Amino acid sequence: MDKGISKKIKIYIDSVAKNQQWLISAYLFGSYARNQQRAESDIDVALVIDGLNDNDRFEVQVSLMLLASKIDNRIEPHPISKDDLNSSNPFAVEIRRTGIEIKLK
């Protein structure tokens, strides 16, 4: 993966962690994690959030997207609860299967 992209992902995750105490972990997944990205690919980042529930999901998503847009418009945040990440949901399975954990500060 391009070092510039790696740096942008790290800046984004550090910004989220700094502003949101509820971030448990983060994973790069999708085409960038599989090293199959194209010029038009987005940068999928799963953000595991403590206590995320369906009532808050939209508001959290918007907040994460606004922060991502300040760093790189290709960053596509995907908030997910710890319980959902450990479920058999195909989305969660994809994150666990191909995801690369991004270290938090």
Please report, for each region that a protein language model flagged, where it lies by residue.
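Short beta-strand->loop micro-motif that forms the acidic, two-metal-ion catalytic signature
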Residues: 44-47
